[in-house]
From Swiss-Prot:
Control of this protein's activity: Inhibited by UTP.
Job description of the protein: Catalyzes the reversible phosphorylation of UMP to UDP.
Enzyme class per UniProt: transferase
Source organism superkingdom: Bacteria
Protein name: Uridylate kinase
Binding site for ATP: K9, I10, S11, G12, G50, R54, N158, Y164, D167
Molecular function per GO: ATP binding; UMP kinase activity
Reactions performed catalytically: UMP + ATP = UDP + ADP
GO cellular component: cytoplasm
Swiss-Prot/TrEMBL keywords: ATP-binding, Cytoplasm, Kinase, Nucleotide-binding, Pyrimidine biosynthesis, Transferase
Length: 317
């Protein structure tokens, strides 16, 4: 089955430890979740550099903006090297790509090389943003998502679980948005991403999931609908379609009872009692499900039940 591409944006601020530039426990937690996510998706990672370099320091010492931005780009390379080392230690293959030439450290950001790496089930770690000053890492994420045809951008935030109309840590009455269009976010000036990045995502029909990064299983919980998050896209119906993701089908199947009409078949029971390759069943079933209307959740679940039931009964006989 052809895997969809997900680009995960991790802010530098979320990486920072109390006394060190990187919280190693948090980095290990990220690596573990990336490994799980890569079983079902192609994964590219973009790391910020805010744990190492902040723009306010540049202002205090009178540094020119372009030099400050270049330091920020180099900080993303340092974080990328740390993440790559951790992934290697847990047997996850990865490659670092840089939009600035540094051949002894990273591969050049060339689309065909990136696509080859992703197709070989490697994690692509993207560093240096767009490679140009005056552009944020958010814009770099959006450009990469558009160039590579990503389905989702996962925008991990520090200490906030989605998009609000004001800072929820300061305003207990802040309004939370479960779904938001890029147009509305730009109009209201909400801090989802910068205007350039939002415009690129809007034009390229890329969906963005904004979630709380610094909590256990933050990435997986957001992608499996087990935690609070905001989905940003141009169609509100995307929220229903997202709720019926592939991983969600599998999770629901493992938890439900064996009732063909109303519930999804209990996969664990079948797997224990028979020698069927359940993973193959799901792969074939999901390909058929993707041909159906994504917004008709109940119909899709019923169809999945019928496919698995038929396969199960044929093999049991």
């Amino acid at each position: 089955m052809n895997k969809e591409l997900v680009i995960l944006k991790i802010s530098g601020a979320s990486l920072k430890g109390k006394n060190d530039i990187i919280d190693l426990d948090f980095l290990r937690e990220i690596g573990r979740q990336i490994k799980v996510l890569s079983n079902n998706y192609k994964v590219a990672i973009v790391l910020g550099g805010g744990n190492i370099w902040r723009g306010n320091i540049a202002k205090e010492i009178g540094m020119q903006r372009y030099k400050a931005d270049q330091m920020g780009m180099l900080a993303t390379v340092m974080n990328s090297l740390a993440l790559q080392s951790l992934l290697t230690n847990i047997n996850v293959k990865s490659r670092i790509f840089s939009t600035i030439e540094m051949e002894k450290i990273a591969d050049s950001y060339i689309i065909r090389n990136l696509e080859e790496s992703l197709n070989n089930n490697e994690i692509a770690i993207l560093s240096c943003g767009t490679g140009r000053p005056y552009f944020t890492t958010d814009t770099g994420v959006a450009v990469s998502a558009a160039e590579l045809g990503a389905s989702y951008i996962m925008m991990g935030k520090n200490n906030v679980d989605g998009v609000y109309d004001s800072d929820p840590n300061k305003n207990p009455n802040a309004k939370f948005y479960k779904h938001l269009t890029y147009s509305k976010a730009i109009e209201l000036g909400l801090e989802v991403m910068d205007i350039t990045a939002a415009t690129i995502c809007k034009q390229s029909n890329i969906k963005t999931i904004v979630f709380k990064m610094n909590e256990k299983n933050g990435i997986l919980n957001a992608f499996e609908n087990k935690s609070k998050f905001t989905l940003v896209s141009e169609d509100e119906k995307d929220l229903d379609a997202f709720k019926f993701g592939i991983k969600n089908i599998k999770n629901n199947s493992e938890k439900s009872s064996n009732n063909w009409d109303n519930k999804v078949i209990d996969i664990k029971t079948i797997k224990e009692e028979n020698s069927l390759n359940i993973d193959d069943i799901f792969e074939n079933s999901i390909e058929e499900l993707q041909k159906l209307k994504e917004d008709d959740i109940q119909k899709n679940q019923k169809k999945l039940n019928e496919i698995i039931k038929s396969f199960y009964q044929d093999n049991k006989e």
